[in-house]
């Protein structure tokens, strides 16, 4: 019904739907981290032909939406026998023929008819390569006539041809070429409409799917229809309908997707390992010869897409006399990706992050990742991962860093230190329920400090090159609905590390250790205003803690300069603090418009070398006010802060994802 169509259009996540991205909630925690680190990801595909005949977007999310909406019609069917007869148009770019779908798989026909060249990848069907039929027939009233329509009310949402002054960029030129290609047929077909309704779509395109654009276009459509009201009333009389006649509405239609459960006779998979089949069947509680909720099917789809192992995931649900047959079609990833991150801030000016990730065609899924960071501090990391089971990985990594860091004391720069850092890590990670990840392993670290440049009167340190072996265990739980500026969710992290210099002792004595934990929650009181409380801290356990592991506090983010760094609003720079630190914080965040945010932050830090005396020392308080813009290239932020430790106003600017 019209109401259902309106509801369907307004409730879609169009930016996600018109991309190949996986929604934040359905991504693995690794994918979430990558999506909030890199501004550009370029696939270096193994199959070159896919690049030649491809588009920017594969249309995986659209294809799954079409499959969802057409559940119960996944067989090859006659479209004329649908409750409302249907046809759609594509063009076969092999020979330029117009292809009119009157039968076949409904979802495939819909996907082929909207494959805009250069935007969405074409649909391969037998020996045909099909794209959007707009270049051949973008107002197909002739097809409606051929199907038996005596009366046609034609609604035209195509842009008029542009003038020379309006052709100023590649997109406008490309759209003009498409419109010119089918212009003759278009003008002929307008004459076949009994009532022709021309909607003013100036200023909008086929990609205008944000809420303001949708509302404007719907209103313009209504205005265009009312302009033809006299013609519509005249048509009503001509076909013999009384003035008080109201046409019976079709529907309301209900999708099988909305039903509670279905009986599934058989579940089959194409392109999946037997171990993965058993895992997904168990994970999503899928059983043959049993009733299944449609939510289980959706969970299986999102789990497979978010597993990082498959590039495309689709399904067919076919009705048989014995029950439904559920068939999953998967394309395994054997691809390489080049990822790029870039950011600017008021301290390090510019930083660049490059990453290449390549999967191997091995019996046990595996991949290698090579990362490099350029800037004031630089880094190189090589990581090899084995995944014997879905969501369970063994990681082997080596990392080198050169760091150049300023350390402050009560707001004044105390000294600058430069050092080289080497680490080798063996770890195991396991993801439970998509939002919870556990990790454990062994780490080797070597610190070689080169220079300490002190301000006049600063305390001198003697830090010699030193190596450490550490055991670690960590847990991370995250239910945010997005990485930056989330409107709901919780983040909980915890890590315990035990440090030695020979795997059992440190300098002939018991090892020392560190325990760090954090909690933060986002509670939206309205759709624009949110409270974000948090509690976090780090405790060092043992005597004579080496310099590289001393607690550090300051800045906007966890672990930005040092892994143990704790953020604190009002302390702009990095300061070395006591062995036990506990911080409580509250943020008040107001969204202005759709992407602008103003945030007020207040926090208090309790600290002492002895954890049991942490309440005895005078606490440090601080606060800040900041502005942020949620851009396509990451957060653009600026803040002013003040604290009782520095006793001065600090200013900080960050442009881009933090890494």
What are these regions (language model features)?
Residues 2-302, 306-313, 317-318, 333:
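Patatin-like phospholipase
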Residues 5, 96, 132, 144, ...:
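Buried hydrophobic packing residues in well-ordered domains
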Residues 90-93, 102, 199-201, 271-273, ...:
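Flexible glycine-/small-residue-rich
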Residues 92-94, 273, 319-321, 629-633, ...:
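A generic beta-sheet turn/junction motif
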Residues 295, 300, 306, 312-484, ...:
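Gram-negative/organellar outer-membrane beta-barrel architecture
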Residues 337-342, 472-476, 480-593:
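C-terminal outer-membrane beta-barrel translocator/porin domains of Gram-negative envelope proteins
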Residues 401-405, 443-447, 493-503, 538-540, ...:
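Short glycine-rich beta-strand segments
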Residues 589-620:
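C-terminal hydrophobic structural anchor segments
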